[in-house]
Amino acid sequence: MPLVDPVTMSTTLIKSGPAQQQPAPKAAVPAIPLVNSPLALPASIAHSVLLAGLFYWRFDALVADPVTSLQTGLPVVAAIQAVYLMLSLPPAGSSLSSKKPRPGEKKSSDGREAKSFPTAVISLLLALILTPALHILLVLFGAPFLTHVPHTFLCCAHIALLAIYPVFYVRGSDPVPLQAVVGVSAPFDQTFGGFLGTVVGAWLGSVPIPLDWDREWQKWPVTIVVGAYLGYIVGSQLLGTVFYGRRWEVTPEMKEE
């Protein structure tokens, strides 16, 4: 009976055994393109122009009476956002494909038209539900706690319409893409660009408040709202078009040996 080398035998058994399963990589969160519609791009541009025009027109009223101006402007901004989302972006759960049908091929329907309106309504409600949480967050970052409560709450409602409403519309309640958006690891598109622009703009808008310029527009929360709107318009259009599909580059930390 021939001798069997135990080392060779163990090596053979390891090679012939089932391959060790590697952990599956996390699915990449895709960028959200505009829908394949002739109205998508014009509606996207028009919505930014309308927001900028509305804000410019109401700026003096915002400075004179922030609460009334923010309150009356809230339903108008919500309507502009809702129409833009339904015309330009796919609702959560619909196909992300922007492929045009070939000549003679019948365009397939993914139910986008049927999902757009209910998704827009539900996403709006979710965004407004998070307004108290944004209020608490702003207070933690230095907003007035016992005074200017309606000012802060209405400011947070506008931020929710700009930053959170579009994200819920295209991402839904799936925690994976939502974590990517909050963690700044999602690819740039109009919704993530608007989210990032609103947050950065509102943060930069807080810079002039403590300065001793004694200007009327420095009062709370005028500069915060100005920064949020400017950041949203620039972020959604610039990051959503010029840098579409790219990701925020984060330098990995050096691992300890």
Curated annotation (Swiss-Prot):
One of its GO terms (cellular component) is endoplasmic reticulum membrane. InterPro entries: GPI_biosynthesis_protein_Pig-F. It comes from the Eukaryota. It comes from Gibberella zeae (strain ATCC MYA-4620 / CBS 123657 / FGSC 9075 / NRRL 31084 / PH-1). Keywords: Endoplasmic reticulum, GPI-anchor biosynthesis, Membrane, Transmembrane, Transmembrane helix. Pathway: Glycolipid biosynthesis; glycosylphosphatidylinositol-anchor biosynthesis. This is Glycosylphosphatidylinositol anchor biosynthesis protein 11. The gene is GPI11. The keyword Membrane applies. The chain crosses the membrane at residues 37-57, 73-93, 121-141, 149-169, 191-211, 224-244. It is a multi-pass membrane protein. It is found in: Endoplasmic reticulum membrane. Acts in the GPI biosynthetic pathway between GlcNAc-PI synthesis and GPI transfer to protein. Belongs to the PIGF family. One of its GO terms (biological process) is GPI anchor biosynthetic process. The keyword Heme does not apply.
